[in-house]
Each structure stands twice: as C-alpha cells, then as structure tokens.
Amino acid sequence: ESSNKRENQKQIVDKHNALRRSVRPTARNMLQMEWNSNAAQNAKRFADRCTFAHSPPHLRTVGIFSC
C-alpha cells in the first residue's frame, strides 16, 4: 500500500503542511503535522468501508487526539 511507504508519507505530510502554511489569515500557533501510524490505520479502516460520509466523532479519536 502506497501510504505505508515513508517517501509517500513524507510527501503527504509536506503537502499538508504547505497547504496549512498558506491559509489566510495566518494562524498564530499552528503546529506542524507529523505522520501518525495509528491515525493512518484509523483513516484506512474508515476508507475501506467506502461510505461517502463523515465518521462519527467516537471513531475520530486516536490516543489522546481527536479530530
């Protein structure tokens, strides 16, 4: 799977961070995103279900992080 390869993960993270840096107005305290394997696995589980909808909030929590 392509998202498991470090090079692809780096491209995803770099692009995401570049897009976040380009927001206007700029954020005062926007943290840089890092790859999180647990979050990636969680996203893949949801994507594998192939539904066109947002996941419920309780499924968007990985460790102490939620989105």
From Swiss-Prot:
Pfam families: CAP (PF00188). Its main location: secreted. SUPFAM superfamilies: PR-1-like. Contains 8 disulfide bonds. It comes from the Eukaryota. One of its GO terms (cellular component) is extracellular region. Blocks contraction of smooth muscle elicited by high potassium-induced depolarization, but does not block caffeine-stimulated contraction. May target voltage-gated calcium channels on smooth muscle. This is Cysteine-rich venom protein bucarin. It comes from Bungarus candidus (Malayan krait).
